[in-house]
Structure formats: C-alpha cells, structure tokens
C-alpha cells in the first residue's frame, strides 16, 4: 500500500485521483445514470454511490469517536463479512440521486476529509493505535488512519475511474454499432 510523508502529500494524492475520477462523469447525461452495460458491474450512479458511501463512513467513524461513541466498523448494521450487503445498501441509499447530486455529495465528503486530515496531528494520522476505530476495525491488522483514508479515496478513485471509462467505452461503442446497423437498414 502506498505510504505518505505527510498530510500535504496525502491530500495532494487524494486531490489528483479525485479530480481524474470525477471528471469522467462530466460527459455522462443524466438519462444514462442507471444504464447497465456488459462487462461493467456498476452503473454510473452505482459507481458514485459506492464512493459516497465509503467516504461517508470514514467521516462518521471519526466524528463518532470524537463524540465519545463506540465505533463499529464498517457500520452499525454491517460486519466486514457482509460487504456485498453494504454495497447494496450504498446503492439503495444513494444511487437514486441525480449524478450532479452524487458528485456534489462526494465533493463535500472529500472537502470534509481534507478538514479531517487537517484536524489530526501527523502522529494521529500516521501512527498506529491513535484512533480506537482504526485500531479495532480489523481483527488481523492494525491500520493507521491514513490507510483507511487511502483505501477509501485514492485507491478506489483509480479503480472506479477505470470502471467508468470502460462503461463509457462499452456504452458509446454499442451506440456506434447500433447507428451503423441503422444506416445499413436504410
């Protein structure tokens, strides 16, 4: 997993990967937000809903700990062996929104994650056992807070950018094939 020298380096990497990811949605019309294509597991709305869901959880973990609440990861209603159900919950909770609403929510979450990073000391961000929620999140490993931020921002922004690019390619290629077939019939 990628490591970072300091907060600024982490924020720059989030910014870079987020900008590339979110840009891919600029040319997808709202009418296609729920369109399925072969070989791609998520629609554009589901793709964004996944990102909104995970970034919302990261922010909730930190907010709840600051309030003195016990944090259950990944969420109060799901265990780590129920990620499929959690992903479906993300879809059910967020994917009905417009692409613009989803992009706005994700942008707000990323800005809140920047503020969260700024509010933590370098030690709290990069050393283990500095947050209960990060230390107790998994049974097999203790992760520093920055790792949870990385795997819920930088890493999926890259992976899901590839998925949405594939979605666009498959969708627009199928449109070209359909138009070519129509021309042949005419």
Annotate the PLM regions.
Residues 2-5, 86-100, 139-147:
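Acidic/His metal-coordination segments adjacent to aromatic residues that form catalytic metal sites
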Residues 4, 10-11, 80, 102-103, ...:
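Short leucine-rich amphipathic alpha-helices used at interfaces
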Residues 1-20:
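Extreme N-terminal tail/first-helix region
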Residues 34-85, 128-186:
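Short, contiguous alpha-helical
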Residues 18-29, 55-59, 63, 107-121, ...:
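Structural signal for well-ordered, non-membrane alpha-helices
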Residues 1, 12, 35-38, 93, ...:
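Short N-terminal micro-motifs specific to bacterial/archaeal maturation
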Residues 82-126:
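Acidic/histidine-rich alpha-helical segments that form the ligand environment
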């Amino acid at each position: 997993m990628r490591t970072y020298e300091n907060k600024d380096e982490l924020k720059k990497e989030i910014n870079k990967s987020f900008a590339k990811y979110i840009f891919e949605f600029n040319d997808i019309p709202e009418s296609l937000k729920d369109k399925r294509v072969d070989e791609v597991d998520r629609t554009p709305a589901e793709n964004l809903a996944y990102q909104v869901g995970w970034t919302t959880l990261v922010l909730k973990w930190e907010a709840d700990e600051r309030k003195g609440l016990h944090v259950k990861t990944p969420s109060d209603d799901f265990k780590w062996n129920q990620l499929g159900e959690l992903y479906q919950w993300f879809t059910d909770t967020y994917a009905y929104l417009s692409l613009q609403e989803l992009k706005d929510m994700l942008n707000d979450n990323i800005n809140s994650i920047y503020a969260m990073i700024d509010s933590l000391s370098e030690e709290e961000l990069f050393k283990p056992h500095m947050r209960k929620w990060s230390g107790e999140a998994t049974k097999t490993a203790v992760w520093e807070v920055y790792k949870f931020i990385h795997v819920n921002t930088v890493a999926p922004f890259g992976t899901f950018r590839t998925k949405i690019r594939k979605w666009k390619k498959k969708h627009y290629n199928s449109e070209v094939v359909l138009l070519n077939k129509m021309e042949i019939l005419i």
